[in-house]
Amino acid sequence: MVEKRKISDVIFGKQTETKRSTGYNFFRDDPAESVFGSQFIQGYNTSAGNWNVSGLGNGESNSAVTACLQLLGLSFSEATLDVCAINSDGQKEIIPNHPLALLLRRPNPFMSGDVVQQYLINGMHVSGNAYLLKQKNEAGQLVALYPLMPEDVTPKGTKEELITHYEYETGGEKLYIDQKDIAHFKLGLDPKNYKKGYSPLKTVLREIFGDESAGQMATALLSNMGVPSVMITPKDEFGPTPEEAEQISKSYQQKVSGKNKGKPLVMSGAMNIEKLAFSPKDLDIGLLRQVPEERISAVLGVPAILAGLGAGLKHATYSNARELREFFTENKLIPLWRMVGEEITQQILLKDYEDSTLYQAEYDFSDVRALQ
């Protein structure tokens, strides 16, 4: 049972009638087990090995991913959104202080326009989707836009129409939100479900998992002051009792780890000490983390140098960093500005403000520093 509510009901918690969603979906809502919902992950579209990622989530908590998303979000916010109209000469004219442009500077009482724009970019790249809920007054005028958590929103459709409404899960209940009351921003299309966008991060979850594992390994070694695991065995045929073995183990740990690292260890009896684990030098953990950084930055379209990732810093100079920022702006940000501007035009401007296609919302990036 899906509860049908007005937007004011969703925001302010009023109760209304319920309505059951009916109809056949144009595309199935629950395709073969999602890569994000699975306990294991394989290489994208392959069957090459399984990795347990039950605690990894969608990858956004990874530090390399966060560095790239921060750069994307902050850089995207540098451009300003204008509402334009095409005049009789076919030229675009900016409409000063258009209500939509003013709204997007402060979409709701709690968030600035920059914060909401960063949400859009992060949501599109992490989950493939970002959603803005429209709040309207009694006269039907748009007065606020609220971002929704992408993982809590499910687009629904019928056999005849791709998307008819959205289900928003909050507080253990599912709310029905009409399609016209949400602006849905997609990054491409999910090849298994055209109602949703496509997340580039899902193709590198394996690498993200590897990066997290390498970090955990480095932390474990460092917490032991860089001393790898060892096996202690007696040289003579008479071994220690279980109690003696436990005491030897505790004594070894106390003498060679933590603040006691480097102190001499004196043991009774002849003993062999064999190293079982690799040292940080043997593992070359820095190299293990380089490949994930390279692939994460590649699928997100962010040069590693600009994100401050180690994979790019060793080749960084002031000159090539400046060239890469221009490359990043022209090949990543400008297409994003055009994509988001078109969605704002179609889903907000023409639905809630203007009824003529002569109007459009577009980002002005003429003052973006990287293009000067």
Give the role of each language-model region.
Residues V2-I285, R289-V291, R295-V302:
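Structured, contiguous alpha/beta core segments that scaffold functional sites
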Residues M225-E243, K263-Q372:
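Surface-exposed loop-to-helix/strand elements on domain peripheries
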